[in-house]
Regions:
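Walker B catalytic acidic pair
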Residues: 148-150
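Contiguous, well-ordered alpha-helical segments that form the cores/surfaces of helical PPI scaffolds
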Residues: 128-133, 164
Length: 255
């Protein structure tokens, strides 16, 4: 069990969709993968960073935080060139446990203009929050990153570019859910699982779809015509939807 605990502490990251919601509301902290040498791992078990407020970390940990921000900037420059992160207003501060610490804030810089991360979009904050974990997943064979609704708030084309890079060269494992169909255009069919309407068999691999086919079109065709082991979607009637819209629009007009 100690091996599993060690793996969970250092090589497994799970980012639920509630983190994205809290980031959008600027209410909470998010887990950030801090790259530390093996010799220091026993003292450092992970960190929660406030992306929209001030942080206080120990003096021993601060250099690793600064290195992580540098890592994120390298990736962000490739994804969104006009945005860089900066550690702002760092100074010595006594921590609650009586040890020496450093207080700092993380801000974004656009065209030499400093902007509090508070005012960035939810999509930008989400990208920043998972960047360090993506770096670890890309470079470490033992690393597993699990992200709920990876597509939430992220530009569709950028999502596809990120997935293409991870599929081709990542050493670790990335597991994610998505409502967006863009991943179907990028990922090989062998890497895809589809949700069904059957609670007893919620996830299936598709049948009769080869990697040479347009997976997105094949998926949409399966929704309309069937052909998979399970039903993928409860069919909706467009005419009933139109009628419902008209009826709803009349509520209260003649009351």
């Amino acid at each position: 069990s100690s091996m599993l605990q060690k793996y969970g502490l250092y090589d497994l990251a799970v980012i639920e969709n509630q983190y994205s919601a809290l980031l959008a509301l600027n209410l909470d902290m998010i887990p950030v993968n801090i790259s530390v040498p093996d010799s220091a791992r026993s003292q450092i078990t992970g960190i929660m960073l406030r992306l929209t407020d001030t942080n206080v970390v120990s003096k021993e940990l601060y250099p690793y935080v600064a290195n992580t921000i540098e890592q994120i900037n390298i990736v962000m420059k490739a994804l969104i060139p006009e945005i860089q992160l900066e550690i702002y207003n760092d100074f010595d501060k006594l921590m609650e446990n009586g040890k020496d610490g450093i207080q700092f804030e993380i801000i974004t810089v656009r065209d030499d203009a400093r902007i509090p991360l508070l005012y960035e979009s939810a999509g930008i904050k989400k990208l920043i929050s998972i960047c360090s974990n993506l770096v670890a997943c890309y470079n470490q064979e033992s690393y597993c990153l699990v992200v709920d609704e990876l597509d939430s708030g992220i530009y569709e084309y950028l999502l596809g570019e990120c997935l293409e890079v991870m599929q081709e060269k990542a050493k670790g494992q990335l597991i994610f859910t998505s409502h967006n169909l863009r991943p179907l255009e990028v990922l090989e069919n062998d890497f895809l699982l589809y949700t069904t309407v059957n609670p007893e068999n919620r996830y299936i691999k598709s049948t009769y779809i080869k990697n040479t086919q347009n997976t997105r079109l094949s998926y949409l065709r399966s929704i309309k015509l069937g052909g998979q082991k399970e039903k993928l979607y409860n069919e909706t009637n467009i005419y009933e939807m139109e009628l419902a819209m008209r009826r709803a629009g009349k509520v209260g007009l003649h009351g």
